[in-house]
Amino acid sequence: MAEPEVIHSWSAPRSLSTSLMYSFAQRLDTEVVDEPLYASFLKATGFDRPYRDEVLSKMECNGEKVVKDVIYGSGSKKYRYCKHISKQRLFGLPSELMSRGKHFILIRNPLNILPSFEKVHPPSFLELGLGELVSIYSDLCQMGTPPAVIDADELQRDPETTLRGLCDDLEIPFQASMLKWKAGPIPEDGVWAPWWYKSVHESTGFSSPKKYPRTFPLSHYDLLERSLPLYNILRSHVKHSSSLLSSPLPPPSLPVPENAKLLAWVGDEILPREMAKVSVFDSVVQGGDSVWEGLRIYKGKIFKLEEHLDRLFDSAKALAFDNVPAREEVKEAIFRTLITNGMFDNTHIRLSLTRGKKVTSGMSPAYNRYGCTLIVLAEWKPPVYDNEGGIVLVTATTRRNSPNNLDSKIHHNNLLNNILAKIESNNTNAADAIMLDKDGYVSETNATNIFMVKKGCVLTPHADYCLPGITRATVMELVVKENFILEERRISLSEFHTANEVWTTGTMGELSPVVKIDGRVIGDGKVGPVTRTLQNAYKKLTEDSGVPIPTYQEP
């Protein structure tokens, strides 16, 4: 008799592990072993079970002998499938248990495990074994053999695709016989089967998931909170091969691929991109109740940091935020986020301050009793517009909010007014959309302030209907410094159509020349001399000023 190739299945209880064992038992080339380490586990831990004495009398209790003779002993078939429960991997077992054979991990959402487990045995964190599952995954990765991870939910919804993917990972051929079995027990069942395997014995294959879940027992809520993070760690390594389970949309490509692995500040901690989330009870989710700023980093310095913070805190005060973090706390969060990411140039920060988490859903700020939520999202992001060749604008039918309704001087996150205009520009492949005020005069674009030049005079709309941008104010100062005439007044759309030069301003895009509006070519269709002069002056200002980032050293 030859030594079979051993396949190790590691899981928590109530994770369809027995159904999967039955599946492998249908293969003509595979023998299965049901929890060979169980007796060793019961003897070492002293855990009580209704069948404890029977297990100890009928199974090998010596862990070393189990590994040597039961798991890796000789056999009559090509493969030996060993079903393991993760908590049964105790310290002191021979190292070859993990170093030999092929391993995979089967996971299931604790939200589904706990109601099922409770029907047979009181659950606990140790009994679930999710911590040990993470440890098993880590140990195998450390050995250079990261295991495949499959999710029981996928196994239920699309058994064939999931099993084919698992067989590919294990480098064994898939067999269609794995999809069905006869109802009733099999000879390989452990002696505990009458307590745990009732539903499997009634099945003839992987049952489809129930349309609606069981009511979750609130007595296990704390256990769920402790267990879910561990489940999510393992779930992030599942390969979603099933078309029924994967997103109907293809994975999007990021504008800057390096941003796939950024770190963001949320609340009071720095988190990886996919973990950087706010509560569903946060005000920004409940009603866009938040203020924000955009900042840009140039060669180790944050440009106009103090001015942006002034506006952030003014906006928070205008919205009557309570328990606002101190200015120095916000600065430290910005610095720590940038330093942790190693972002010292070509970086844009989206700085948000929400009213915070609510005790219950609803718009009333009276429900906000946790204090504000601070978010620092730093990304590698060059200017988003074509500042060399110029951009095209269209005029939106959506009018800019009147201060009678919502004052644009509050830099708030409720951007639907702007987004509706942006949709119009997207539909025409324009960079942005000009927004008019209620009387038909130009206010700004959906994302930027706007300037024009006519007969040597620089004009920009007054700020009654637009956000008085930090970049706008900076450029207005540069206009005067460069000895151009500056006029701030109401400007009609036709004046922009017939301007000699037009540009937009904003932290995200800096100074962006406009070469066409609503199909009308601006000037000669090229970047004008006033625009270029101010672009150069702005660039020099970003090089010469800004708040230094601690620890930054020039290359």
UniProtKB/Swiss-Prot annotation:
GO terms, biological process: carboxylic acid biosynthetic process
Signal sequence interval, chain numbering: none
InterPro entries: Aminotrans_IV, Aminotransferase-like, BCAT-like_C, BCAT-like_N, Class-IV_PLP-Dep_Aminotrnsfr, P-loop_NTPase
Pfam family name, one: Aminotran_4
Gene Ontology MF terms: catalytic activity
Coiled coil: none
Family: Belongs to the class-IV pyridoxal-phosphate-dependent aminotransferase family.
Protein name in UniProt: Branched-chain-amino-acid aminotransferase-like protein 1
Organism: Arabidopsis thaliana (Mouse-ear cress)
